[in-house]
């Protein structure tokens, strides 16, 4: 029952009380489900004891499910079997429009437990009669023994009540309750008014006969004798016409009345209108209706808007507790909302932190090898690494000093930025590590920090790509393409992280010095190879020519070489450009590249270089 099982079971002690309180439950649920259009139920007991159920609804055609629901409730909640028949069905015009009005007759079947214990033989019936006579005799004996009527006189009618509670009637326990009413009302008029500070008494013509002082305080018009109640109030709930007939039809509903603003004093026009919520009770002997009510308030703010105080509400009225508890609930809700807002702000800050952290990691990985950067982030000390074989490349711009002299600084920055962006892309294509850049000098190493066997081929392909990329960068002085000198050497190095505030991954050893000498002794637009670099690239698909023996500063005479091209790869493949040829049907498809062209290339980290993934050795 969606969690409402306990609430439904506590609505009433019998079927009639259950149905009478359904409207109150619907009023409560309407606070949470404001779009709910609930029906209304009214029970009427006839003079012959028959029960009539009046069903009202804005939605026609749903009355046929009512018998099944009521019969199920009677059987499940009260262990009785009932049947329902439709006596009358019509439409009535109310304030909110037409309502379907259906009258059901509810008839109780024989009790299920009685059917199970029905006597089957004559002797069983006679035995039950003997048991009843014995119980009657025992009751009289207990009465004479324990209760002295002369010492404690009790009315005979009271003994009838006691007997009805404990005696068996017709074979089953009587579960009826007969209240005892006083012969006179032991309460003064003033005391009654103080106990119920908000109440109104009116007759069948809606003429006000009595109104408590607290209501007169907030509705001054009630001080006038014999005024009409509907002139100062309108019915908010239930949605019925304001007359005694409609009120009596929905006597078991909770009534909400609202003051009419036009009847309030002019000085009060800006105030919130007063709403009263309570119960209508018909006084048959006086032919009047009493409305026992309380202000419909939920918070201290609403109390202040009405210029009202808690002292205006009776101490026994739960409206006081409702206001204070709801105020505490509102404070808790506000605190919860603040926490929710802080949570959302924290989530936004966490996203910004993640973005900044990503930027920091990107910058750190640009300065240091990834595995070295991870060790530093974890607070670990990075040990120096010795690499027995690697290939180092140096490059610089020819006549760079002259270019700097003839150009503005911003032009130099733009030239270097354009050139280095192309070179950085090539490092991803050929999976080599950029060590550093100083001015126009660019240093790359293969086989460090991760040892690989084909480091020389990787660096050679990178050098050829540098030479091609340089043709796309214009010399701002001459207007011609930039010219590079490139030197490559293969040998052992020592690698370590140097510095704390600005750590750098540095290479040490004679291999670094020799590679630098190959660059400085090279020629424009040539890739200069040392003897060890030549031996590493020999028979690997590269076109290499011998330069001859030259004097190298600090090294003496050396036979060096020039790298011309990769015989197994095109320029696009060297540059890592994707190729998408058009087939004979006009659709584009990826080129199928041979697997043996670029010696030593690996799968690049950038998506645009994915065409090199098939060139692995």
Swiss-Prot record:
Q: Where does heme bind?
A: 26
What is the activity-regulation note? Activated by nitric oxide in the presence of magnesium or manganese ions.
**Tissues where this protein is expressed:** Expressed in gastric signet ring cell carcinoma, but not in the normal stomach.
* Keywords for this protein: cGMP biosynthesis, Cytoplasm, GTP-binding, Heme, Iron, Lyase, Metal-binding, Nucleotide-binding
Q: Which GO terms describe its molecular function?
A: GTP binding; guanylate cyclase activity; heme binding; metal ion binding
Q: Could you tell me the Gene Ontology terms of the biological process aspect for this record? A: cGMP-mediated signaling; response to oxygen levels
Provide the residue span(s) of the region labelled Disordered: 577-605
Broad class of where this protein is predominantly found: cytoplasm
Record localization: Cytoplasm
Which cofactor names does the annotation list?
A: heme
Task: List the residue ranges forming a coiled coil, or say none.
Answer: none
Q: Where is the sequence biased in composition, kind Basic and acidic residues?
A: 577-586
Gene Ontology cellular-component annotations: cytosol; guanylate cyclase complex, soluble
Comp. bias (Polar residues): 588-604
Q: Please tell me what else the database record remarks about this protein.
A: There are two types of guanylate cyclases: soluble forms and membrane-associated receptor forms.
Q: What does the similarity note say? A: Belongs to the adenylyl cyclase class-4/guanylyl cyclase family.
Q: What is this protein called?
A: Guanylate cyclase soluble subunit beta-2
Organism encoding this protein: Homo sapiens
Its taxonomic path starts at: Eukaryota, Metazoa, Chordata, Craniata, Vertebrata
Q: Which gene encodes it?
A: GUCY1B2
């Amino acid at each position: 029952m969606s969690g409402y099982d306990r609430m439904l079971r506590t609505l009433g002690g019998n079927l009639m009380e259950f149905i009478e309180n359904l409207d109150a439950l619907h009023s409560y649920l309407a606070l949470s489900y404001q779009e709910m259009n609930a029906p209304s139920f009214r029970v009427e007991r006839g003079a012959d004891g028959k029960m009539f159920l009046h069903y009202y609804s804005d939605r026609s055609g749903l009355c046929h499910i009512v018998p099944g629901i009521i019969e199920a409730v009677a059987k499940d909640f009260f262990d009785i079997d009932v049947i329902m028949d439709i006596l009358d069905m019509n439409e009535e015009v109310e304030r909110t429009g037409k309502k379907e009005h259906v009258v059901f007759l509810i008839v109780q079947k024989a009790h299920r437990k009685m059917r199970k214990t029905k006597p089957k033989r004559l002797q069983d019936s006679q035995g039950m009669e003997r048991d009843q006579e014995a119980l009657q005799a025992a009751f009289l004996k207990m009465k004479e023994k324990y209760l002295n009527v002369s010492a404690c006189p009790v009315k005979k009618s009271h003994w009838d009540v006691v007997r009805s509670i404990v005696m068996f009637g017709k074979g089953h326990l009587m579960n009826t309750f007969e209240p005892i009413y006083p012969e006179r009302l032991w309460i003064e008029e003033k005391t009654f008014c103080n106990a119920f500070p908000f109440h109104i008494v009116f007759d069948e013509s809606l003429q006000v006969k009595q109104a408590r002082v607290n209501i007169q305080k907030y509705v001054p018009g009630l001080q006038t004798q014999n005024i009409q109640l509907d002139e100062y109030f309108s019915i908010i709930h239930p949605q019925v016409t304001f007359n005694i007939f409609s009120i009596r039809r929905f006597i078991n509903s909770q009534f909400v009345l609202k003051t009419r603003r036009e009847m309030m004093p002019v000085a009060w026009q800006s105030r919130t209108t007063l709403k009263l919520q309570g119960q209508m009770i018909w006084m048959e002997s006086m032919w009047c209706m009493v409305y026992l009510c309380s202000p419909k308030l939920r918070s201290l703010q609403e109390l202040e808007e009405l210029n009202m105080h808690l002292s205006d509400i009776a101490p026994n009225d739960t409206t006081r507790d409702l206001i204070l508890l709801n105020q505490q609930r509102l404070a808790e809700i506000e605190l919860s909302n603040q926490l929710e807002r802080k949570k959302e702000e924290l989530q936004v800050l966490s996203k910004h932190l993640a973005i900044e952290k990503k930027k920091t990691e990107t910058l750190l990985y640009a300065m240091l090898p990834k595995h070295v950067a991870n060790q530093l982030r974890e607070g670990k000390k990075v040990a120096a690494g010795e690499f027995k074989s690697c290939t180092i490349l140096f490059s610089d711009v020819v006549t760079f000093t002259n270019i700097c002299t003839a150009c503005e600084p911003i032009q130099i920055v733009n030239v270097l930025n354009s050139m280095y962006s192309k070179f950085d892309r090539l490092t991803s294509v050929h999976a080599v590590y950029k060590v550093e850049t100083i001015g126009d000098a660019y240093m790359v190493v293969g086989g460090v920090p991760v040892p690989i066997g084909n480091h020389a081929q990787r660096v050679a392909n990178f050098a050829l790509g540098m030479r091609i990329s340089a043709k796309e960068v214009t010399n701002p002085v001459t207007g011609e393409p930039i010219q590079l000198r490139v030197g490559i050497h293969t040998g052992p190095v020592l690698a370590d992280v140097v510095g704390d505030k600005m750590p750098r991954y540095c290479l040490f050893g004679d291999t670094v010095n020799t590679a630098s000498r190959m660059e400085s002794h090279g020629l424009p637009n040539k890739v200069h190879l040392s003897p060890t670099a030549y031996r590493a690239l020999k028979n690997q698909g590269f076109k290499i020519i011998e330069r001859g023996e030259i004097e190298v500063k600090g090294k003496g005479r050396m036979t060096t070489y020039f790298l011309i091209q990769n015989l197994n790869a095109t320029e696009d493949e060297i540059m890592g450009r994707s190729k998408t040829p058009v087939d004979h049907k006009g659709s584009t498809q990826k080129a199928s590249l041979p697997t043996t062209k670029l010696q030593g290339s690996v799968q690049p980290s950038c998506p645009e270089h994915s065409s090199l993934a098939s060139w692995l050795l």
